[in-house]
Amino acid sequence: MPDPNRFHFDEGSTPLLPGYEDRTVNSFVPADPQREPNLSIARDRFAGAETLSDYVARQVLLLKKKLPGYKASAPAPVALGGTLGGLAVEASYRSGATSVHQRQAVFAVSDERALVFTMSSPRAFDAAADALWRAWLAGFRPADEA
């Protein structure tokens, strides 16, 4: 079992210093980002006794305030690795002259921590992007099974 006082990554590990927590983001960039979506996984923390639904609602409100033209769907159920339930939101907003399409799925991995999977693209999502999203989420394995 990994030492919880160290941050582990492919190339090695480093101590997690007192007062710091892991909020890393893993970004996966395609060879052609104009045609294929970017993917990322972020780690976050719930605020107090916040539920998954509360977390998603808070994040949507924050994004509406920060991103011009941000529009989001109602949260919908989604599964990670076929077993862990979460909530997904489809959204779009403007970044300068570019429209950004985004899909996010949030999963509670403990009472305090969340994993946020994001797919974003300047192009509207098509059947290929939908298949990529489903395969990416379905392919998740918890650290103790990886």
Model-derived features with residue positions:
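N-terminal targeting sequences that direct proteins away from the cytosol to non-cytosolic compartments
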Residues: M1-G86, Y93-R103, V109-A146
